[in-house]
Regions:
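C-terminal non-catalytic regions of proteins with extracellular/luminal or membrane-system context
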Residues: 1-216
């Protein structure tokens, strides 16, 4: 089965301009419906944005200087629009499929009641062809890992650093943090790292401490 999406209503310049009369900020929602056996396809309405969605982004960014994109999707989609309209799109939020409380959680973040603290659990590349799994994607008989052990961020870190648009572990916040390693201890069975985290911003928030290791 193919992934499906809700067709966007036609968005005229007049509608966008009338919205600008009541707010100086705009929020664009883009959605995808995915599930088992119909996660994604390299088509418009799947991995790629539709022409209606691209037109919507173009119209809104032509009027608004401060635009937020909310992606209500089940998987990473093409993010090239973030480069093209980088001067107007101030933030992009992957809301994923949040379940019955997803709407409340999203509203809390957008209204500033909660500071976002999530980090990307996958690497977002510039082009779909940059992913090593692209050539084997969609085979309904077998999952072929031609990239061997270089799955996900390992592949980009090793072979294609310049192809990364948003790296594994990336994420923005309404505040800023300063992290300092206090101590680290290595034994035969474990590694213990103590980190001091200081909120250097003006609002409360949470930070994800990320530790990366490699073979000696």
């Amino acid at each position: 089965m193919e992934p499906w999406f809700q067709k966007e209503m036609e968005l005229s310049k007049e509608i966008v301009k009338s919205a600008k009369d009541v707010s100086n900020k705009a929020i664009i929602f883009i959605g995808r419906t995915a599930g088992e056996d119909k996660d994604n396809q390299a088509t418009e309405g799947g991995y790629y944005l539709t022409q209606d969605e691209l037109s919507m982004i173009k119209e809104v960014t032509s009027v608004f200087e401060d635009v937020t994109i909310v992606l209500n999707v089940g998987n990473i989609i093409d993010m090239s629009f973030s480069v093209k309209y980088n001067d107007k799109i101030k933030s992009i939020l992957y809301a994923w499929h949040g379940g019955m409380e997803g709407g409340n959680a999203l509203a809390d973040v957008l209204c500033g009641d909660v500071t976002p603290s999530g980090k990307l659990a996958g690497t977002i590349a510039k082009e779909i062809s940059d992913y090593p799994s692209d050539s084997n994607f969609g085979d309904d008989r077998v999952n072929l890992y031609e990239e061997d052990i270089y799955v996900g961020y390992r592949y980009f870190e090793t072979f294609k650093k310049d192809s990364v648009l948003y790296p594994f572990g990336y994420g923005l916040s309404y505040t800023t943090f300063e992290s300092t390693v206090i101590s680290s201890k290595v034994s035969d069975n474990e590694v213990v790292i103590s980190v001091e985290v200081i909120n250097t911003g003006s609002v409360k928030g949470k930070e994800v401490i990320q530790v990366y290791v490699s073979a000696p």
